[in-house]
Amino acid sequence: MTKREKYHQLIADVREDYLHRPVAQTSGGPKLLWCEDCKQEINLWTYWQNSLDAKIMLVGQDWGCPCDEASKTTMHRIRQVNDGGIEQFFPNLSGKNVNPTDGNLKELFRVLGYDLKTKEPDLFFTNFILGYRDHGTSGGFRQQWVRDDAPYFKRLAEIIEPETIICLGKNTFEGVMFGLTGKTERVRGFNRFLDSGENRRTVSLSSGKPASVYAVAHCGTIGTMNRNRGKKAEDGSNLSSKEIAVQKQDWERIKANGIQKK
């Protein structure tokens, strides 16, 4: 099978699993469902950056609910891509109503030399959890979700064979490490972990190729607020949830390891 054939087989397998996954696994709090709008890509986020020959894989935790008000414009554009009405999907990255995560990712990837307003052949975006909440965008995260989707993430990583995997947030990093190694790694004190510079692991994919796995803070409002906790601006004031200077320093350390656009 070609790489693309393996990829589309993976999408079909994940969909089939979610459609028949016992309700008991997702009872209590938000339930995870498959999104039928994932027709061309494995994840809604993947419509943004989706090179199967990517050098860098960006991994988030989970999308949230695609049916909520905040997702309407995004879902409309993705459906246009699926129907052939437009060729490519990009989120709104300028002007009003820019999603904080998307806007901050644009700035953070600029540290590595990438422009997220274009399709970058080095990049592939996905969430680790491939299902979608039936309501809400956060809270109620369950380790069962990680155990269920870990085999699919491993298959995805082994199709793409990235050199670098950047994980947004503690749960994502722990999930990726479990998915790729089968071992559980628990991070205590996530900010200290990032500050230490020891937030990099090297794993071997089934082909024998190594991949560097980096933990970074999620760059949404809450993740940025948590990363800035206890940090001060140059004038001594507290950093707000809109300031990503600390996260830029984290990404500069990734760049210092040679991870950047060539």
Language-model features and meaning:
Residues K183-K262:
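A hydrophobic alpha-helix/topogenic segment detector
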Residues M1-K3, C167, G236, K262:
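Intrinsic low-complexity, intrinsically disordered segments enriched in polar/basic residues
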